């Protein structure tokens, strides 16, 4: 039986493969059904490998690459870090953030508001007239203009993961589990995920919702009372989502959902960057607000400092030759970072409050009890953000953080992979017995 990989699609694509899966030993696992709103099917797009036991990854292979695609002047397609670096050379030939458009039809009345936000927040031009589905315009240095579908761009990233995994393992990998945010719960998004898998050379075995995958990675179903509830909060690099899930007859269903496709860790980075742009102006007399190259270097340094402050009280923002011979080397404390982003952190809490209110409305009264809170995404590792979420629930709810938030969805898809292989193996043995 061909082994599969786990792919989690966020601001970056994550790929994991466990040692146990590589040995192709017999697998047992938990049936993880796709999370659904009542009466609806709900997709998600992620593919992951199977760890030896729940919560223990024992990973022999793991890869994470940014969701960037670029086109060099010689016609070469660049993916991941290479593509992001090329953006500094020719920003019109590099794109990112296209996950938000997967399966979307911006000409539909229900998606016009989203379409307007796309125009306001994404720097590249989007053509909505070609084949109904949105196509992204890229322009190389020689002036060549290309229109590329979102599925094709996404498949380029997935194919890069597939190629890297096969080179490492020494054999073909043909199957994957995909995960998508719960917001992508329509058949168009689900179909786009399967189509992306086929373009990349994968059999997309299943499409899961990220909240379901994360909850099952933590084994929430083993502790949750019947019809108990869990809040799943996802704050990634560029998107944020909060949902309330309930467990009914062993399956997760969604009681509420709040999704912001243009809010996340990049907003925190921007606040720090703006702070240091002002500092450079006042201290060195240089205005780098219109200098794209300098801003990119500063933004990268600020993001690095932000991550450091998740586990340290102090960090330094260091950029050599920022502009006109100016070397930047300035301290940034966790307290300063929290002050700069306080209102944005409260925006995350507001997301949680809205989704909890939706869940209470479902019950038509206030009997809703939240049993657990699961965190997804690298931005949820920020200590102040965790503190505010914990305080929202009166300090009585421990946040499920045993598994790293930026890996938990991938591991949840791995668990589902185990179950699929177990079912297929059981079916194969049953057929052999009958014959």
Listing of model-derived features with the role each one plays in the protein:
Residues 2-116, 128, 139-151, 156, ...:
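Oxyanion-binding/catalytic loops of NTP- or PPi-dependent enzymes
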Residues 121-128:
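Short amphipathic beta-strand and strand-loop transition segments with alternating hydrophobic
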């Amino acid at each position: 039986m061909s082994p599969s990989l786990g792919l989690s699609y966020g601001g970056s694509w994550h790929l994991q493969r466990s040692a146990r899966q590589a040995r192709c030993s017999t697998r047992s696992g938990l049936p993880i059904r796709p999370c659904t709103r009542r009466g609806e099917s709900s997709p998600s797009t992620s593919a992951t490998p199977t760890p030896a036991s729940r919560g223990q990854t024992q990973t022999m292979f793991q890869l994470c690459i940014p969701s960037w695609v670029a086109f060099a002047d010689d016609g070469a397609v660049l993916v991941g870090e290479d593509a992001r670096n090329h953006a500094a050379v020719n920003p019109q030939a590099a794109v990112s953030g296209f996950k938000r458009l997967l399966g979307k039809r911006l000409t539909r009345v229900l998606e016009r508001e989203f379409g307007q936000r796309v125009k306001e927040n994404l720097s590249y031009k989007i053509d909505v007239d070609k084949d109904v589905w949105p196509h992204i315009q890229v322009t190389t240095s020689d002036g060549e203009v290309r229109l590329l579908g979102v599925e094709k761009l996404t498949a380029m990233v997935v194919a890069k993961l597939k190629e890297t995994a096969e080179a490492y393992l020494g054999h073909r990998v043909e199957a994957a589990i995909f995960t998508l945010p719960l917001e992508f719960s329509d058949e168009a998004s689900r179909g786009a995920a399967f189509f992306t898998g086929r373009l990349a050379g994968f059999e997309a075995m299943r499409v899961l919702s990220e909240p379901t995958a994360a909850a099952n990675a933590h084994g929430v179903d083993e502790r949750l009372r019947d019809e108990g509830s869990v809040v799943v909060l996802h704050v990634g690099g560029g998107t944020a989502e909060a949902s309330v899930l309930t467990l009914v007859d062993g399956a997760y269903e969604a009681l509420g959902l709040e999704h912001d496709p243009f809010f996340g860790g990049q907003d925190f980075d921007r606040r720090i960057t703006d702070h240091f742009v002002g500092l450079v102006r006042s201290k060195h007399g240089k205005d780098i607000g219109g200098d794209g190259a300098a801003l990119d270097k500063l933004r990268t340094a600020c993001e690095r400092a932000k991550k450091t402050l998740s586990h340290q009280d102090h960090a330094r923002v260091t950029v050599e030759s920022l502009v006109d011979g100016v070397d930047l080397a300035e301290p940034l404390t966790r307290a300063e970072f929290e002050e700069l982003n306080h209102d944005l952190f409260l925006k995350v809490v507001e997301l949680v409050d809205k989704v909890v209110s939706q869940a209470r409305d479902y019950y038509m009264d206030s009997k809703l009890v939240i049993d657990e809170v699961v965190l997804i995404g690298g931005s949820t590792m920020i200590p102040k953000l965790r503190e505010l979420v914990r305080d929202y629930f009166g300090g009585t709810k421990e946040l499920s953080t045993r598994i790293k938030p930026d890996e938990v969805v991938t591991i949840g898809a791995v668990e589902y992979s185990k179950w699929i292989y177990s079912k297929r193996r059981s079916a194969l043995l049953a057929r052999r017995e009958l014959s």
